Amino acid sequence: MAFSKDPRRTSLRDSSVEMSSGTQPSCAPKAMPTAHVTFLIDCATGKQVSLAASTAPPHASRANQGCVAPPMKTFVMFRGKTTMLGTQNISLSRGALDGAKDTLPPYRGLGAPHSLPASLPGPQNDPKAQGSSLKPGATEKHSTREKVKHSLKALTCLCGQVE
């Protein structure tokens, strides 16, 4: 079988040889992240909930993975009195927040990071509820709400992907 002398076919053949010879193609503009890190915060306790370690063995790394993007971080808030099965509570300390803040990319949102409302919507901010008496445990819920609110202000920039 004879090859055509057409330059387009020659360049196509040459590029396929280059690909199979081990040269890596140039990076795609958006590479997929290699991992997805998820943080869960229980709104009822104001604590971070860590997921139990996975029992699945780690994936073997391939020799040629091409372009690799850093992991994507996601923060998930949930409400309730019970924690998920197989989870362990870890309190949100200021040190943990500072460590997470060091890994953040610069803020690229439309508004300023401090553009959160000064207070979260709730019965303590409702003008109708101002005259009513607080139920037992309301102070504890308010304290938990404040912890979560301050934690969220510190983690405002984590809505996107770490670059």
Curated annotation (Swiss-Prot):
Coiled coil: none annotated. May regulate the transcriptional function of androgen and estrogen receptors. Residues 1-30, 96-149 are annotated as: Disordered. GO terms for biological process: positive regulation of intracellular estrogen receptor signaling pathway. Residues 17-26 have a biased composition (Polar residues). Residues 1-16 have a biased composition (Basic and acidic residues). Interacts with 14-3-3 proteins. GO terms for cellular component: cytoplasm; nucleus. It comes from the Eukaryota. It holds the Pfam family C1ORF64. This is Steroid receptor-associated and regulated protein. InterPro entries: C1ORF64.
